[in-house]
Regions:
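Helix-loop-helix
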Residues: 1-250
Length: 250
């Protein structure tokens, strides 16, 4: 499975690299190899946009039924098992699957990351079978993206900060993430940036470059959706206004 994903990513990266190389002189401070990783990240993010949108919609639906959730928590606070059963019944009735979309996104990201790890560790096999000796792989202060970033405060730190911003924005814009049965898991996500930092300082720098760009793109999409998509409360106000208009016409 991972080899298959690595093969697809390698072919995509090679196609992007060849397209860039055919276009002219390579920039001085950033190699086509690095640019290919950035463009590949953008393409992968575009492909996973439906999952991102689904995650956001599930969050909005959960927010809409939050009053009912609060009522159940208050009414059955004496028995956690009964409360969980009532919550599950409410989710089923309302067609809400909290956490499913976000878990799916995490699984997709993990599979891609593992595939990319295989590509970065064996670039010669998956991207340049003819050899990589003559291929530039630098990115500003990094001389070779197939090796770890020499600066701990470079890409590993940027990766941690970008992931922290994504998690923080999700929790701030969706209050239900910090309350109810999902609260413990979501709060534990705040520690993930630290884990990423400790991990990425030892891995090929191409991985934190990919993950940083992926997190920033995801954050941009979330911000756009947050400020453009109508919230449940706004939708209710619109529906009430339509009903009032019809009533007044009669």
């Amino acid at each position: 499975m991972i080899n298959f994903i690595a093969s697809l990513l390698g072919k995509l990266m090679r196609w992007i690299y060849d397209s860039l190389a055919a276009g002219g002189i390579e920039p001085e401070n950033i190699s086509y190899y690095a640019i290919a990783i950035i463009i590949m990240t953008l393409l992968v993010s575009l492909i996973t946009i439906p999952v991102t949108i689904s995650t956001q919609k599930q969050a909005e639906q959960t927010q809409k039924i939050k009053p009912k959730m609060d009522e159940i928590q208050k009414k059955y606070s004496y028995d956690q098992q009964i409360m969980q059963q009532k919550m599950q019944a409410l989710y089923k009735e309302e067609g809400v699957n909290p956490g499913i979309s976000s878990c799916l996104m995490m699984i997709i990201q993990l599979l891609i990351l593992l595939g990319l790890f295989r590509v970065m560790n064996d670039t010669k096999t998956f991207v340049f079978p003819e050899g990589i000796e003559d291929i530039r792989r630098d990115f500003y202060w990094i001389t070779d993206l197939t090796h770890p970033d020499p600066l701990w405060f470079g890409l590993p730190l940027l990766t941690s900060l970008s992931q922290f911003l994504v998690t923080l924005f999700s929790m701030k814009t969706n209050p239900q993430m910090s309350e109810g049965p999902m609260s413990s898991m979501n709060k534990s996500m705040l520690f993930m940036p630290l884990i990423f930092f400790m991990t990425f300082i030892k891995l090929p720098a191409g991985l934190p470059l990919y993950y940083t760009m992926s997190s920033l793109i995801r954050l941009i999409i979330m911000v756009i959706m947050h400020f453009t998509v109508k919230k449940p409360k706004q939708l209710d106000e619109v529906n009430d206004e339509k009903v009032n208009n019809k009533t007044s016409k009669k």
